[in-house]
């Protein structure tokens, strides 16, 4: 890591409490002589100290190696939850990994960090963060928030402070995570970015996603307990050129709802900007209530993901999604592109969640066409006196098949007697199985049943069913 070539960008915040250094300065690598287009990587939720699956000491070096192998990066951003519980020993593991140049395919001069909720789970959390990350800031305390310009693009990082909760049901949690001093600082830096870089997007990085934006931030749309805060919405809503990268949810990048742009500049939701979910480099989860296996279905600890953001020759911004567990791009034929000018006029990533707040009648993405099974697909059944085990092929979709709805109907009564919602395992990408098998119980011996399997995408578009009739076997003789 080159610690010689630096410019100083002053980042001061006047937040009360503890003995933390709230006037720390970020040392910014001098890239003024580099004329190559901007390119940077983003990951989040690395959770050093966690032993989920292979653990951070295996998963994060692999992610660094893979993401840096695709070309030279101007910055590498880690969007909070750096640690499992904010301990100094956990930060020491992080420094060990990120300072080891053998973990990088190409050198990276600029690492950007910020605090997430897990980084506050310690009485010395702020001090541990600032002191431990000194190797990435010229030996000086690492700042909580930072502002810098890299190749003409403004970068703003915003730490969140001591809370374990979102502010959906407890607004005080939001004011604790993002206190007034942080809000005022962000207002100043957003205004500065707009003045210094008037035709550029403003890249903002913070752990907790703004409400009513990407996946997991809409309690109105079946996500159960939301994973968001509305604290920053009023500031960001003033800047349609804001591009916010947020983690926390651990939701997979393969879900098309991982990117969102607003449709109404006057919305009470205050969401007229871009938000991109950054997933996790520890493990992935699903929204509550989607599949029967819960938020951590099979393979959840074998999923780590990240992003590479590239400046295109025409000034647009391209976002590539990567599976850093398997070293492969996620949906390379469907890369996200943020189009210039960045004033909201080119927003294309709004969807049906905005249907009740679309006075300008903008196009809302609905995920169609519905998923489909290949011609000739069929069900394979194993039947007992009380259950049926069904094996079926994976369906196709223009985005991803999220889950399968299975229903067993009593033919005589015309009543559904057993049902299931089965995860497709799409987040395993090339390791996604070609077929799935599931058992449904509660059948009566000797009765005739029909079984249907339908594929569903993230927008609940449903395929035509695969169907089969069968009869439960008779009970064994005593």
Identify the residue ranges that each predicted region occupies.
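C-terminal motif of bacterial Sec signal peptides marking the signal peptidase cleavage site
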Residues: 17-18
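N-terminal active-site segment of His-dependent metallophosphoesterases
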Residues: 22-91
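A short C-terminal boundary segment appended to hydrolase-like catalytic domains
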Residues: 34, 296-412, 416-420, 465, ...
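Active-site neighborhood of phospho(di)ester-bond hydrolases with catalytic His/Asp-centered motifs
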Residues: 42-44, 75-81, 110-117, 203-207, ...
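Active-site-proximal segments of metal-dependent phosphoesterases and phosphodiesterases across multiple
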Residues: 55, 164, 168-179, 193-246, ...
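Extended active-site neighborhood of metal-dependent phosphoesterases/phosphodiesterases
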Residues: 87-191, 195-197, 231, 254, ...
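Recognizes extended acidic, P/S/T-rich segments that occur
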Residues: 403-444
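Beta-strand-rich modules
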Residues: 443-459
